[in-house]
Amino acid sequence: MRYVVFRLTHELKKRTGWFEKQFPIQPIHQDYISLEAWRHAQIPFFLQAMPARPYASLPVKTIDPPACLEGRIKFFNAVDKALGLDYDWLTHPLTGYRYSNKVHWSKVNDFSAEAGDIKYVWEKSRFAYLYEVIRYDAQHDTDHSEWIFNEILSWINANPVNAGPNYKCSQEMSLRLLNWTFALQYYKNSEHLTPELFSTIQYAMYWQAKHVFDNIHFSRIAVRNNHAITETLALYIIGSLYPQFPQAATWKSKGKRWFEAEIAYQVYEDGTFLQFSMNYHRVVVQLLTWAIAIADGLGELFQEVVYDRAYKSLQFLYAAQNDETGWLPNYGSNDGALFFPLNGCDFNDFRPQLNALHVMLTGHALYENGPWVEDAWWFRASLNGRKAMAPLERKMGWQVFTKGGYAILRDAETISFIRCGSHKDRPAQADNLHLDVWIGEQNVLHDAGSYQYNTTPDLVKYFMGTSSHNTVMLGHHDQMLKGSRFIWYH
């Protein structure tokens, strides 16, 4: 009932213009903190801590000049797109459709066949590609801060507050805020970060964070997945790191409480995840790592359930992981999301992210030394005085995760992974009894993946339906009745 009432109210606000009043386009510019004051503030960000060893000592290959410096961006961690150095942040790279930056975000149609999948416009605007440049600068002792700040300024100039496609999704804004924060901290003392530029950036950051807070119940009630975890965490972090922002204390306190509630609800007692997706579960692992690193810097603790579900998540994901490659079954929805690419490993290699969180919780590496230790280095991962959890050990034989509905059988050479359970929360795919089999490093029986969300009905039916899974079908019938978009009825 709460969901129905919220959706009806949300639609009414959209149709009556309420959102246009609540979220005004390009409000009057204000300064909340000066660059000098910000630089001298004792901001508890993990990058401020001196590394235990220099970047050069990490077992990382020589990093080539990032392709983004030439205008090439990797989309969904799979396909390079030559957007050019003067990309306008509004044009769909496949369809050529250009969104207006004068239309209020509530009027933007994000499911338009003419425009194409809006995620293609959102992808660069996440600013995850900045990590390529930051890693390059760390290894080569170079400074591309001017280029990075020009990218941020270009985005701000092209995207008036609360207008256009890049203000449509609060999760996208949250990721942008975290990635800008990381870059600002890394290049904090750059001569290219001028008072005028900092004023422009902090104005855009404030209004994006305010948007996330004022619309937080859309993700917490209508969506209730990794979006809600991302957004509530962003509120906690922005409220903590920018206390001069109006409402910062409220963002921090409510963001923390909501984040704890989302982790407790979305990560089940056995460490499985309500989205039934390995890749989205990795998204949560990265967000948990951010959360614990920031809280440690603040000298704060989350409710015990956060650390427990973080540890249980590692237990589940590690149980399904191939030791030779670091890959997991490509099970569930996978749109190529990797919010914070802080290493040079393959996208499908989960070792960097699992290791960073494992070090944070146990004080020990999960794997032998290799390029996958880089994430832990960036997060300055350590126990920081917290009680150590037991380091994970490889287990053979059966492991059953009843709440999520998975069974995993391992021996020295093979892994069998089967989905077998009921759904407490809405499923993304009709895939009960799906079987994944690994022999050595080869995934000989595997999931087909999920492709795109906004595509033709037949492709949606195939990738979300039973046909693309190793399981039983009666004729051409899916196991469940399909509803609209991501919905399965029964």
Predicted regions, residues:
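Aromatic-lined, polymer-binding surfaces characteristic
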Residues: 101-310
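Membrane-proximal basic amphipathic "stem/tether" segments
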Residues: 1-40
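Carbohydrate-active enzyme catalytic cores, enriched for enzymes
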Residues: 272-275, 279-444
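Active-site rim segments in enzyme catalytic domains, especially the processed small/beta chain
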Residues: 431-490
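Low-complexity, Ser/Thr/Pro/Gly-enriched N-terminal "stalk/linker" regions
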Residues: 67-107
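Short alpha-helix boundary/capping segments
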Residues: 122, 168, 173, 425, ...
